[in-house]
Amino acid sequence: MRLHEYEALDIFEQNRIPVPHRGLATTMHEALQVAGEIGYPVMLKAQVLVGGRGLAGGIRTASTPDELKDVAEELLSSDIKGLPVRKILVCEKAEIARELYLGITIDGYSGRPVIVVSTEGGVLIEETAQTAPEKIAAIHIDPSFGYYPYQARSLLRMLGLKQQLIAPWSDVIGQLYDIALRYEALIAEINPLVVLPNGGLLAVDAVLEIDDSALSRIRRSLPDRAERIENPLERRGREIGVTYVDLEGDIGIISSGAGLGMASMDIIGQKMKPANFLETGGGITADLLYKCMQLVMMKPDLRAIFINVYGGINPIHEGAKGVARYIAEHKVKIPIVAKALGNHQEETWEILRAAGVHVVTEAATEKAVEKLYELVGPAK
């Protein structure tokens, strides 16, 4: 679960990380009131759960009340990457002497927390890694021993920093690590961590994403995860009990497991563009597959649907009944390709073929994708 920036900043402030003076606004008048209390100039930042807000016009500056009125009204009537802007964060505009980067995430290979720092803040850390890797340093933390302040100091010395910056920055690293540990964060990030003219530090941006599996263990006031899923298709997926991730392509995907789903996406992505990732979590009932078809078909401009299911204990012919019912009721015109193997597979093939589905009986997902490509051709 990713928190909004204003929520992450509140947590940072509670844990003694210096953050800007700020206030949340849902109307232009509220934004004016907050700015009046803070003092101009101010930053207005759209609060949506996507990255790249700045490039999309979601982070703006206002130096006067009149300018703020225009900017606030424009932001609150806009959307960022398809998500409507309902809240804006109004915060003081910091005087910047230097921009740094600090992030803590989980290394997918070792499973350990890794602290990443860079003297190049305000840009994507991935870009810095490509263009100036010498400006990045990282250290893994062994959970068996925990974090010690000397590790942060050693890390910062690797970047050749002076002592007057190492001391306060190492303090922030320790505070952010405590937050990441306490909230079981997948990522905790400050980008940029600003150096002020007086030498102080200020976290002018905050990212905090909490592992969904940890939510039941965190005894703190956190918003319900469903409330922050702003994409209506992803919200609907959660409502029906499947994992749905909206993508930018035009080939809908339904799978009965994460592995099948990711394999389908990867192979389809070589020549075509997936419209979504959807996995049922193992459930293959008629009602669930009907709802999955309904969900995938909500995406506009689909060219085809690709179904990849396997049933060990689950009888997959029940799911086929749901697919067939949806096709019959909604007169689906686009091609549907299915690879369905396992319990009651022959009966499943008969049901799907009778509904007009292109059934591929080979075990290799590549064969089914080849059939899909024959029907729809390359990505457009």
Regions found by a protein language model. Give the residues of each.
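C-terminal hydrophobic structural anchor segments
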Residues: 303-342
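ATP-dependent carboxylate/acyl-activation modules
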Residues: 1-190, 194-307, 319, 341-380
